[in-house]
Amino acid sequence: MAKLYAVGDIHGSTAHLTRLVETVPFEPEDRIVFIGDYIDRGPDSSGTVEFLLSFRERFPKCVFLRGNHEEMLENFLNGADGCMGDAYITNGGGETLISYALNPLGKVKAADFPEGHLGFLFETALTHGEDGFLFVHAGIRPGVALEDQSRQDLLWIREEFFTHEHALGLTVVFGHTPLRDVFQNPPYAIGIDTGAVFGGMLTCVELGDGKILNAYQV
C-alpha cells in the first residue's frame, strides 16, 4: 500500500539528504512531498539538486514544492526588485552560487547553471493537497480561503500562521520556520523544518489519518 511522506527543508545539506534516503523505507509507489528550500545556506546546493533529479527518476510520484529560497533565486536571476545586489547573496544565495563554481560578486545568468537544474527549481508547485493534508512551504493566512491565499504568505508567513487556528478543514504541513523538533498542533498544523542546515536534523514524516504515523530524523 502506498504511503504518504513529507520531507523538510534541505538547504543544500546533501549529506543529510543522502542519510535520510538510506534510512526511510521509501517505495516507488509512495507519494513523497518535499516542502521546498532545497538550496541556499548549506554547502552543496548543486549536489542536492542533482540528487533530487536522480531521486525523482526512481520515485516518480514525488511532489516538489517551491520554497522562498527558490523564489529568491528566480527573482535574483530575473533582476526583480528586492533580490538585487546583496539581498539574495547575503540570505544564503552566495553558498549556492559557489556550489555551482560561480562568483557571487560577478554577473550571474541562468545559462551558467547545468541543464535541468533551474527547470527543476522553478517548476515547483506552491501547494499540494492529499488525504486531508495541505502541503505548503511556509503556511497559510488564517481566516483567508485557500483560493485567496497570497503567494507572499504561502512562501514567507511564520508565527501569524502556526500560532493560530484556522478553518480550512485540512492539516497544514509546512517547513520554512526552523524549530528544534517537529511542531504539532492537531488538527491544524505540522511543522517539519528542524534546522538541518543550522546544526539540527533533517526530518521526514509518514502521514495518515490527519497525524504523523512515523518520523525519521538524521
Residue ranges: model-predicted function:
Residues M1-F51:
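N-terminal active-site segment of His-dependent metallophosphoesterases
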Residues M1-L4, H128-L134, P186:
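Beta-strand-turn-beta hairpins that frame and shape the catalytic cleft
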Residues D9, D37, L52, G67-N68, ...:
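Divalent metal-coordination and catalytic microenvironments
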Residues H11-A15, D40-P43, E71-L73, P142-G143, ...:
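Active-site environment of divalent metal-dependent phosphoester hydrolases
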Residues R41-A125, F161-T163:
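Active-site neighborhood of divalent metal-dependent phosphoester bond hydrolases
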Residues E71, N78, L134-Q149:
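Divalent-metal (often Zn2+) His-rich catalytic cores of metallo-beta-lactamase-fold enzymes
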Residues G129, F135-H137, C204-G208:
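Short, well-ordered beta-strand micro-motif
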Residues V144, S150-Y216:
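Conserved beta-sheet core of the metallophosphoesterase superfamily
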